[in-house]
């Protein structure tokens, strides 16, 4: 059984989607070991407690980043987390944090990376006038929205869209993408070739093409 650690700063809709997928058997051989927020008023923490999950608040305000990260890592390890999922966690992890969980930290971003990294990605995409947007689940590394891409889902930008309607449709795909990515990573049947995330069944073909 794999133990997931969830980090969030807000309502945690992707956390809820992960929890629902576990309960429904769509995520295999996994449980949520702990939910951690850096904000005491995060609605996601209330939701976690209502679901009977271990839920911790480790405030970040006024603390150096690495000091806070060490407290979070200690809590994750105490609860046996072997995969960390960021679900609207509005903190940039320190290199030290990332090194504690190599290829074991996932993030979801509401754009087709590498396009539109950072905050308000949906608004960036809409303002730029792209015809297709979407979401990306990727490994977390030392740079912002940069790690190897695991899963992407596309969403057409309709002529009738506004920023809100586009964001809602992207969020629906986020929930599907995170479940898919977690299953792939927990299965362990993958390799990273350069920057490419490749399922192991495809490795021979990739090596032949190089």
Predicted segments with their positions:
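One-carbon transfer enzymes
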Residues: 1-210
